[in-house]
């Protein structure tokens, strides 16, 4: 009997494995693809295929990431797995792989380890909304009480970083035994994916979110007025909609009088479209690159925020020397560079290339931002770091 053809109609959800080195993230990834391929169609991926992750570039930073996909009975999952700890840090901070939820893999034989904690903290800082837990290597632990203890420790760790430890699904299994086909452990993989289906909500579609367009260019067309161009980041825009221009200068209100794409007039534009938008009553000098056009009231300009930052190593083309407090690079948000000053956490004197660190940044001009917005850190046009807005201060 032929496998059913791949149905695009299933909701699409992005997930990834996180957790300490050698706790079995990649083995679990292989196990899920194998079990789901057998149950729901699709293709299994072997450990070695996943482990030899190809290099990709995100915001000028090289990251090794493996992408696999699989089907549950009611969803299509895209799943990322990284070979090294540094790749996780970079991946989560650059948002190269946006996760709707994460699978925290923790070895039942070892319990939570430093990277277990660090990945939970990173998930909190970069806005991964949901975590499900897979306690791996349970076949190596005979003592029921020890398993319960490890489960309790993981739940407490989640609580410490404001994830709901008590409500988080925790599945106990063995990825290796599942790959080897031992039925009780195959069932645990099915249980894990069912928990993901239940506990991780399908993300809101980009078109359902409030409209925002980062402005790339501004033209004035004689007899018609001012046109701003850019790619719609999220939402939908209709001719006649009221919008605000936010960032850098005081916020201005205007009305959309035309939307065009490839020189054709449209009634509306939506997330992903590269468009020109004709705005009423604004002059060319009233608007500049780096501002955003957005649904009124949906996003505010801010200058001071806390960020989680990854600083490129020398090998990645970053700085060769550390930086200290008072460091003033440019912060590249969406389409423009804004100078800002850096405050380091208490007790931190300097930051070395290759570090990841939490810092407070004060920009000289306000930028339209929400928590979760990504940015690059640049010095004279060269990328030296990547960051994500973790918390807005003012």
From Swiss-Prot:
A GO cellular component annotation here is: cytosol
Specify where the region named G2 lies, as residue ranges.
60-64
Q: Which residues cross the membrane?
A: none
Region feature (G3): 81-84
Enumerate the CDD domains for this protein. EF_Tu, EFTU_II, EFTU_III
The entry's Mg(2+)-binding residues are 26
Where's it found, cell-wise?
Cytoplasm
Identify the Gene3D superfamilies for this entry: P-loop containing nucleotide triphosphate hydrolases, Translation factors
Q: Where is this region: G5?
A: 174-176
Q: Look up the EC number in the record and give it.
A: 3.6.5.3
**Which residues of this UniProt protein bind GTP?**
19-26, 81-85, 136-139
Residue span of region G1: 19-26
The annotated region (G4) lies at 136-139
Q: One Pfam family, short name please?
A: GTP_EFTU
Which family does the similarity line name?
Belongs to the TRAFAC class translation factor GTPase superfamily. Classic translation factor GTPase family. EF-Tu/EF-1A subfamily.
| NCBIfam families assigned | EF-Tu (TIGR00485), PRK00049.1 (NF000766), PRK12735.1 (NF009372), PRK12736.1 (NF009373), small_GTP (TIGR00231)
- Any idea what job this protein has? GTP hydrolase that promotes the GTP-dependent binding of aminoacyl-tRNA to the A-site of ribosomes during protein biosynthesis.
- Cite the HAMAP family for this sequence: EF_Tu_B
Q: What is this protein called?
A: Elongation factor Tu
In which organism is this protein found? Francisella philomiragia subsp. philomiragia (strain ATCC 25017 / CCUG 19701 / FSC 153 / O#319-036)
Q: What is the lineage of its organism?
A: Bacteria, Pseudomonadati, Pseudomonadota, Gammaproteobacteria, Thiotrichales
What would be the name of the gene that encodes this protein? tuf
